């Protein structure tokens, strides 16, 4: 084989190998922070699922604390631990869902107040997409809220938010 043919053959083999690597299915890792192993083995759900650079955190009940605000703060601290298990941070969170125990709209709005406060402590800028839902009950009795999240590892390193501030509200005549 001529040197030119050998070089072309090598390039084709390398290109084929690179293509095979880029089209391979991402890895899927089931993870659980210390203390959450029972979720996987007894209740049969994965606390943290890592697929490639995507991290999915199952619902974390706000179960520990003296009041709703403390319980919610505990849940966000647990979220940090869950993300860390997969190599992600709070800055990498791209979506947040929260499920709030409430019997009607008025109670939902009231119970959302401590969530808004604590959410602001953990997300100071470049906020994730967020959906808050009222529900009559959660699996963990006494938990006022449960949070789940999705993150993309590394996405929080250089976020960009080009959203202008709204104009101040105008007084009503």
List PLM regions with ranges:
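Bacterial N-terminal signal peptides that target proteins for export
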Residues: 1-7
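N-terminal presequence-like segments and the immediate start of the first folded domain
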Residues: 14, 19-94, 100-173
